[in-house]
Amino acid sequence: MSDSLVVCEVDPELKETLRKFRFRKETNNAAIIMKVDKDRQMVVLEDELQNISPEELKLELPERQPRFVVYSYKYVHDDGRVSYPLCFIFSSPVGCKPEQQMMYAGSKNRLVQTAELTKVFEIRTTDDLTETWLKEKLAFFR
């Protein structure tokens, strides 16, 4: 049945990369960008970036193709505390091919569960990814 929702597996190498990323000791912003390998029907690592702001990260994301991002962000709270939340960002741009959109949407929950993340956000255009947007989203989790 070609119309059924395709849920992709998570590449075992990516699982290990996500595990290491979760327990990283560095205190800078960092990101893992992931994509769906359509032929293998698997979510795979596309890139790993260090010392990257939200504004720089958005330049790394394609404007017309979906991507998954796990972003470690140095968050300075209003009271001066510093935390390093891991954020899952699903970049799902308007204008993507419907079958590609479905493949990513169908795989999102499995990837979130695999990465054990609770801060899950979605953007419909890469322009939305700014530090202001991220802080607004994170303020909900105080």
UniProtKB/Swiss-Prot annotation:
Keyword Transmembrane: no
UniProt keywords, alphabetically: Acetylation, Growth factor
Gene Ontology MF, one: actin binding
PROSITE patterns in alphabetical order: ADF_H
Modified residues (N-acetylserine): 2
Organism listed in the record: Mus musculus
Name under which the protein is recorded: Glia maturation factor gamma
Superkingdom of the organism of origin: Eukaryota
Residues annotated as domain ADF-H: 4-139
Gene3D superfamilies, per the entry: Severin (3.40.20.10)
PANTHER family the record matches: GLIA MATURATION FACTOR GAMMA, GLIAL FACTOR NATURATION FACTOR
